Regions:
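Loop/helix patches that line or flank the sugar-binding groove of alpha-linked glycan CAZymes
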Residues: 1-143
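Residue-level detector of conserved, well-ordered beta-strand and adjacent loop positions
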Residues: 102, 146, 177-179
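Hydrophobic beta-strand residues in large extracellular and virion-surface proteins
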Residues: 111, 125, 145, 166-168, ...
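Solvent-exposed beta-strand/loop surfaces of large extracellular or lumenal domains
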Residues: 141-161
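C-terminal beta-strand-rich structural cap/linker in extracellular carbohydrate-active enzymes
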Residues: 156-180
Length: 180
């Protein structure tokens, strides 16, 4: 729920600052100036022009996610349903490398799918019947979903007896919004 000291730029925390030295963590002491923050500040212009292309891309993702947290009531106020217990030892879902859950507010259902692996994954996500009952989701063979991170549309099924198939790039995720 918080961004810490350059995280939005991919800060590595590999400077040799403070008492702990080069340990992969950013110091908590205010006498240090973090490289990515300095480059984002760009001499007081705060325009990020000195950041690398990868850092700018990551910053854009963080901006989008934080904006969604304020715009989407399903995120800020909605009901939560964890899907991990229904996907342990899944044939096309690795609970050690992927994470998924649902959020719902009114007629808006959000399916979050995150892939922490470096390779793309074609996932089969089980949504148990309890989720349909608890969140009052109508079962349908085909829903139109919009990925809130990219704006791309895709068709998905939401059925308790058939896995929902989702493709996710490596080190990436999707927030699929479905209007019920």
């Amino acid at each position: 729920d918080r961004i810490y000291f350059g995280q939005e730029f991919g800060e590595l925390g590999m400077d040799s600052e403070g008492f702990s030295g080069r340990d992969g963590r950013t110091t908590i002491f205010d006498y240090w100036s973090v490289d990515t923050i300095r480059r984002w500040r760009n001499g007081g212009k705060f325009d990020g022009k000195m950041l690398t292309d990868n850092q700018k891309h990551l910053y854009g993702i963080y901006q989008r996610i934080l904006t969604l947290c304020n715009e989407e009531k399903a995120i800020s106020q909605g009901d939560f349903f964890d899907l991990m217990y229904a996907n342990i030892n899944g044939w096309r879902f690795n609970e050690h490398k992927q994470y998924t859950f649902l959020r719902k507010y009114g007629r808006d259902l959000l399916l979050f799918v995150v892939n922490f692996d470096h390779i793309s994954a074609d996932l089969a996500i089980n949504i148990p019947s309890h989720a349909f009952d608890f969140l009052q989701i109508p079962q349908m063979e085909q829903y139109r979903a919009v990925d809130l991170l990219t704006g791309k549309e895709e068709n998905i099924s939401l059925l308790p007896y058939k896995a929902t198939e989702i493709s996710v790039e490596g080190y990436s995720g999707k927030i699929l919004k479905i209007k019920l």
